[in-house]
């Protein structure tokens, strides 16, 4: 069993929608509802904690009711940064020894991916899902190519990311004490010298971040429903 944390207090500035991107529609259903439905079907998910902007609480609650989400969903106040939201949410994890952290804007996560992440988290204490980088990656300095990075060992990291609650709490507390801001939760665990296991993600498991991503998400959904 695990508790799911969804940091959902972001403004989504790159989307340029003027509102929380999780409320935007894919095939007439809000992004966050697609995401919640993926975990709604998973019996191992004991509880969902969503760190939100308090001003949007009634909007989220209305979606839960409208779309019949039956899983136990708890709303808490999110922080200024994603990292702050996850740390705050960890204080409310009481029922399980393991936690998954997932981007609310990744609506195409699969049950297979969820459980592979959870299995490795139980084995190693921490796990991520990732896919090989397909593009050539270059390091650029002052608008000029500095070097081409060998991509064979590079991975594009996704969510969900899985952890023992005790380990993730230790990593967040260490980062907080040092004023360290990581790009994801796994980076905080790496920082304290702990191993993070890797499982195969999916190129379909996109994070809907820009208007172009909305179009891609629509096409993915149509393919899934054929």
Swiss-Prot record:
What EC designation does it have? 2.7.7.60
Q: Name one GO biological process term.
A: isopentenyl diphosphate biosynthetic process, methylerythritol 4-phosphate pathway
Q: Which Pfam families match?
A: IspD
Q: Where is this site: Positions MEP for the nucleophilic attack?
A: 151, 207
Marked site: Transition state stabilizer? 14, 21
Q: Which SUPFAM superfamilies match?
A: Nucleotide-diphospho-sugar transferases
GO MF: 2-C-methyl-D-erythritol 4-phosphate cytidylyltransferase activity
| Pathway it works in | Isoprenoid biosynthesis; isopentenyl diphosphate biosynthesis via DXP pathway; isopentenyl diphosphate from 1-deoxy-D-xylulose 5-phosphate: step 2/6
Q: Known catalysed reaction(s)?
A: 2-C-methyl-D-erythritol 4-phosphate + CTP + H(+) = 4-CDP-2-C-methyl-D-erythritol + diphosphate
Please name the CDD domains in this protein's record: CDP-ME_synthetase
Q: Which InterPro entries match?
A: IspD, IspD/TarI, IspD/TarI_cytidylyltransf_bact, ISPD_synthase_CS, Nucleotide-diphossugar_trans
Which PROSITE patterns does this entry report, sorted A to Z? Answer: ISPD
Q: Which UniProt keywords apply?
A: Isoprene biosynthesis, Nucleotidyltransferase, Transferase
PANTHER family listed in its UniProt record: 2-C-METHYL-D-ERYTHRITOL 4-PHOSPHATE CYTIDYLYLTRANSFERASE, CHLOROPLASTIC (PTHR32125:SF4)
Q: Which family does it belong to?
A: Belongs to the IspD/TarI cytidylyltransferase family. IspD subfamily.
Q: What does this protein do?
A: Catalyzes the formation of 4-diphosphocytidyl-2-C-methyl-D-erythritol from CTP and 2-C-methyl-D-erythritol 4-phosphate (MEP).
Tell me the protein's name: 2-C-methyl-D-erythritol 4-phosphate cytidylyltransferase
Q: Which organism is it from?
A: Bacillus cytotoxicus (strain DSM 22905 / CIP 110041 / 391-98 / NVH 391-98)
- What gene is this protein translated from? ispD
